[in-house]
C-alpha cells in the first residue's frame, strides 16, 4: 500500500514523501524507513494517524487500520535527556570537564589538574523551553523580541527584506516601540501555529470530504505559487527589478523637450503646460477635443495639426494631441514612429530614424524628468519620498535603541 507522510521537523521546513510498504510491516521498521527519508532519528519520530499517535512499535501497520492512500503526519519529538547515573556510596565522582581534549580545550583547561569530588546530591538539569511544532519560535532569537529587534536594526539587508516581505512587522520595528513590536511578533507566531495545526488536521481528515478537498487544493495552489516565486528569485532575480522608460532629447519650436517613446500609444500627445512653453497653444484646433482612453481617461483639449520636431540634426514634421492634465511633457506615439520608420534598438540603446538614418540615444535615469525616475533626488519636491521616510524612521529607531541600551547599562 502507498502511504503519504507529511514531515514536520523542528528546525527545517515541512516536506512530504511517499512510501510503498506492506500492511504486515511493523511500526519500528516503518520508523526506520522514515528515518532514511527524512533524516530524523527514529527515536525522535512520532507518527500520527487520524489525530492519534501510533505507540506500539511491534504492531503491524495494517492492524492500525492503515489503508492504501492514507496520509500520516511525522512529528519530531523533543530529545530526551539521559537519566542521571546513580552514585555508589563511598566512591568519589570524577569531574571529566577538567580533562583537556586536544584541539578543543583552552589554555586554562590544559593546565587544570583532574580533581576528585566527594559524593554530592545530583542536581536535576535546568528545565528547557520547549516549542510546539509550527510555533515559529526558533533558537535564533525569535523568543526574545528585544534581541531580534537589535539584530534586525543592525543588519540593513535583513531589514530591507523584512520591509519587503513583512510590512506590518517592519512598521512595528521602525516605530521604536518594543511592546508594539512584541505584540505583532507574537500575533504572527500564533497565526502561524494555528495554520500549522489546521494543516495537520487537514492532512488527517477524510480525503473524500468536499471541504477537505477544497482546502487541500488551495494548499497545493499556494505551495505552487510560493515555489514558483522562489525559483524565479533564484534563477531570474532581474525580473523583480524595475526598468526606466525610454526617453530622448528633442526640440519643439526651438524649445528643449524630453520625449517619451511609446510604441504602444496610437497617437503623439503633448501636455498643455509643455505646449504653452513651446508657444504652440495658438495652433490648437479645439474642434478635435475629446477623451483619451487608455489605462485611465484624460481630456483632449484639441490638436496641433503640424509642428516641427528636431531630433539631433533632423527636422521632422509632427502632429500633437494636446491633453489637459498630463504628467509627461511629450509622448511619441506609433503614428510618428511609423511615419518616419523609426526603430527601437535596445542593444545599442538608441532610437534609429529610418527615413534619415539618424540615431539618438535613450536617456539614462539621471537625465529623465522627475516623474519618470525610479530613484530621484529631493530637489523640487515639497514632500519626501517613502524610502526617505523609511530611512529617517530607521535612523530614529537605531538612535532610540542606543539610548535604551545606555540607560540599561547605567542601571
UniProtKB/Swiss-Prot annotation:
Gene Ontology CC: chromosome; cytosol
A Pfam family of this chain: Ddi2_HDD
EC number(s) stated in the UniProt entry for this protein: 3.4.23.-
Subcellular location: Cytoplasm, Cytosol; Chromosome
Stretches with biased composition (Low complexity): 108-121
Residue ranges of every copy of the Ubiquitin-like domain listed in the record: 1-81
Keyword annotations: Aspartyl protease, Chromosome, Cytoplasm, Hydrolase, Protease
Any single biological process term in GO: proteasomal protein catabolic process
Record: active site: 262
GO molecular function: aspartic-type endopeptidase activity; identical protein binding
Domain of life: Eukaryota
Motif interval(s): Ubiquitin-binding: 387-406
Renumbered residue ranges of the record's region Disordered: 82-144
CDD domains: RP_DDI, Ubl_Ddi1_like
Keyword Ribosomal protein part of the UniProt annotation: no
Signal peptide: none
Subunit structure, as described in the record: Homodimer.
Family designation: Belongs to the DDI1 family.
Role this protein plays: Aspartic protease that mediates the cleavage of NFE2L1/NRF1 at 'Leu-104', thereby promoting release of NFE2L1/NRF1 from the endoplasmic reticulum membrane. Ubiquitination of NFE2L1/NRF1 is a prerequisite for cleavage, suggesting that DDI2 specifically recognizes and binds ubiquitinated NFE2L1/NRF1. Seems to act as a proteasomal shuttle which links the proteasome and replication fork proteins like RTF2. Required for cellular survival following replication stress.
Name this protein carries in UniProt: Protein DDI1 homolog 2
Lineage, uppermost ranks: Eukaryota, Metazoa, Chordata, Craniata, Vertebrata
Amino acid at each position: 500500500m502507498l502511504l503519504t507522510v507529511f514531515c514536520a521537523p523542528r528546525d527545517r521546513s515541512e516536506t512530504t514523501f511517499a512510501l510503498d510498504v506492506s500492511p504486515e510491516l511493523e511500526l519500528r521498521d516503518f520508523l526506520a524507513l522514515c528515518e532514511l527519508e527524512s533524516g530524523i532519528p527514529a527515536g525522535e519520530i512520532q507518527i500520527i494517524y487520524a489525530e492519534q499517535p501510533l505507540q506500539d512499535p511491534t504492531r503491524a501497520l495494517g492492524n492500525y487500520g492503515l489503508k492504501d492512500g492514507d496520509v500520516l503526519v511525522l512529528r519530531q519529538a523533543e530529545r530526551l535527556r539521559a537519566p542521571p547515573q546513580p552514585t555508589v556510596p563511598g566512591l568519589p565522582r570524577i569531574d571529566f570537564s577538567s580533562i583537556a581534549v586536544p584541539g578543543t580545550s583552552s589554555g586554562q583547561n590544559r593546565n587544570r589538574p583532574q580533581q576528585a569530588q566527594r559524593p554530592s546530591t545530583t542536581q536535576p538539569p535546568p528545565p528547557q523551553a520547549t516549542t510546539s511544532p509550527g510555533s515559529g519560535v526558533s533558537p535564533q532569537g525569535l523568543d526574545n523580541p528585544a534581541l531580534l529587534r537589535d539584530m534586525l536594526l543592525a543588519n540593513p539587508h535583513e531589514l530591507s527584506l523584512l520591509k519587503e516581505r513583512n510590512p506590518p512587522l517592519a512598521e512595528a520595528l521602525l516605530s521604536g516601540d518594543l511592546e508594539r513590536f512584541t505584540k505583532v511578533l507574537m500575533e504572527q507566531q500564533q497565526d502561524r501555529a494555528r495554520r500549522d495545526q489546521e494543516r495537520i488536521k487537514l492532512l488527517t481528515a477524510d480525503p473524500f470530504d468536499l471541504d477537505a478537498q477544497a482546502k487541500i487544493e488551495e494548499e497545493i495552489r499556494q505551495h505552487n505559487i510560493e515555489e514558483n516565486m522562489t525559483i524565479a528569485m533564484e534563477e531570474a532575480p532581474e525580473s523583480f527589478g524595475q526598468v526606466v522608460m525610454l526617453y530622448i532629447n528633442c526640440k519643439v519650436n526651438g524649445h528643449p523637450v524630453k520625449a517619451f517613446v511609446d510604441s504602444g500609444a496610437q497617437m503623439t500627445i503633448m501636455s498643455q503646460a509643455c505646449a504653452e512653453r513651446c508657444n504652440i497653444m495658438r495652433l490648437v484646433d479645439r474642434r478635435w477635443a475629446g477623451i483619451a482612453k487608455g489605462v485611465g481617461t484624460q481630456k483632449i483639449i484639441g490638436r496641433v495639426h503640424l509642428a516641427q520636431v528636431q531630433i539631433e540634426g533632423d527636422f521632422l514634421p509632427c502632429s500633437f494631441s494636446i491633453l489637459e492634465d498630463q504628467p509627461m511633457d511629450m509622448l511619441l506615439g506609433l503614428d510618428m514612429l511609423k511615419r518616419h520608420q523609426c526603430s527601437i534598438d535596445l542593444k545599442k540603446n538608441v532610437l534609429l530614424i529610418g527615413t534619415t538614418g539618424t540615431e539618438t540615444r535613450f536617456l539614462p535615469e539621471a537625465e529623465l524628468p522627475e516623474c519618470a525616475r525610479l530613484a530621484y533626488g529631493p530637489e523640487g519636491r515639497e514632500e519626501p519620498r517613502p524610502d526617505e521616510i523609511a530611512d529617517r524612521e530607521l535612523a530614529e529607531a537605531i538612535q532610540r535603541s542606543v539610548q535604551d541600551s545606555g540607560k540599561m547599562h547605567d542601571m
